[in-house]
Every structure is written in C-alpha cells, then in structure tokens.
C-alpha cells in the first residue's frame, strides 16, 4: 500500500514506461508516439489512483456497493472525457435527484400560475364592477327636449338661457 501511494515510485514507473516506449519505437518520425504515451500515462495514473481509493473507501465506508459504483462510474466518465465524448454515465441516484429537481420546479411554476390566475380573476371582477358603475343611463330618463336641433327652429329669445350654445364664443387669454 505504501508503494502504491509513493510519488517517487509512480514517477519512476512512468519514466520506465517512457524509456521502454523509446527503445521499442526507435523511429524518430513516429507521429503517434506522444498520443500513445499520454494514453498509457493516463491509464497508469487511473490504475494507481483507483485501486488505493477503492480499498480505502471499502474499509472506511459501510455502503461499499454505492462507493464501488461511484468509483467505477467516475473512472468511466474520465475515460469518456479523454476520448472526447460529451455524454456521461449517470447512476440512478443522480437521475432521481434530477427528477426531484424537475418536479420541484414544476410545482413552483404551477403555484405561480395559480397565483397569476387568481389575480387575473380578481382583475376581471374589478373591471366588471367599474363597468357597471360607468354604464350610461337609459335614454328615456334623460330630458332631451332642449337638445333636438334647436338652432334651426328657435331664435335667440326662445333659448332656455338666452343664448345659442352652438355659436362660437370669443375667448381671450391673459398673458
């Protein structure tokens, strides 16, 4: 266990791998060498990191299945990211968390819609009351005897107040 976590040991293994690859592929024009070396380095690092982590997690944790599942999913997600995929593997727990979040958001939006609907109903009732107050009274209750084309039939002396309401008046404004 001490050898697995030792940084010098890990670095010496990586150097040994690089030296071995250099001796195997002596062709200096090898174009894929950096890619192969980086993939092998990542795989070695994952191997070195995952085994001690899983051993420690199994010893300290009571729920070993969930920890192993999480470690495996993390390793596969790392490999998928290195391969260039944007998709990730998710566990049922993560899916349930996302579904709970979506359901919570839907409930919040339904409550907001309910509040807005209640406000709109109150506004419609208020507009109906305002309309009922503003409704014009029926024509048969208003005395229209003074309004029927009096300028054609009556003279100035016959008007009720003594002057024709349809004639323009002179208005002077003070400056």
Swiss-Prot record:
InterPro entries the UniProt entry points to: Rotavirus_NSP4
Binding site for Ca(2+): 120, 123
Cytoplasmic domain ranges by topology: 52-175
GO biological process: monoatomic ion transmembrane transport; symbiont-mediated activation of host autophagy; viral process
Bilayer topology annotation: Single-pass type III membrane protein
Residues bearing attached sugar chains per UniProt: 8, 18
Transport is among the record's keywords: yes
GO molecular function, one term: toxin activity
Transmembrane residue ranges: 29-51
Keywords: Activation of host autophagy by virus, Calcium, Enterotoxin, Glycoprotein, Host endoplasmic reticulum, Host membrane, Host-virus interaction, Ion channel, Ion transport, Membrane, Metal-binding, Secreted, Signal-anchor, Toxin, Transmembrane, Transmembrane helix, Transport, Viral ion channel, Virulence
One term under GO cellular component: extracellular region
UniProt-listed Pfam families: Rota_NSP4
Compartmental location: Host rough endoplasmic reticulum membrane; Host membrane, Host caveola; Secreted
PTM text: The N-glycosyl content is primarily Man(9)GlcNAc, with a small amount of Man(8)GlcNAc.
Residues on Lumenal side: 1-28
Family affiliation: Belongs to the rotavirus NSP4 family.
Function in brief: Plays an essential role in the virus replication cycle by acting as a viroporin. Creates a pore in the host endoplasmic reticulum and as a consequence releases Ca(2+) in the cytoplasm of infected cell. In turn, high levels of cytoplasmic calcium trigger membrane trafficking and transport of viral ER-associated proteins to viroplasms, sites of viral genome replication and immature particle assembly. The secreted form acts as an enterotoxin that causes phospholipase C-dependent elevation of the intracellular calcium concentration in host intestinal mucosa cells. Increased concentration of intracellular calcium disrupts the cytoskeleton and the tight junctions, raising the paracellular permeability. Potentiates chloride ion secretion through a calcium ion-dependent signaling pathway, inducing age-dependent diarrhea.
Comment on protein domains: Binds 1 calcium ion per tetramer.
Assembly information from the UniProt record: Homotetramer. Interacts with the immature particle in the viroplasm. Interacts with host CAV1, early and late in infection. Interacts with host integrin ITGA1/ITGB1 heterodimer. Interacts with host integrin ITGA2/ITGB1 heterodimer. Interaction with microtubules blocks trafficking to the Golgi apparatus.
Protein name: Non-structural glycoprotein 4
Species of provenance: Rotavirus A (isolate RVA/Dog/United States/Cu-1/1982/G3P5A[3])
Lineage: Viruses, Riboviria, Orthornavirae, Duplornaviricota, Resentoviricetes
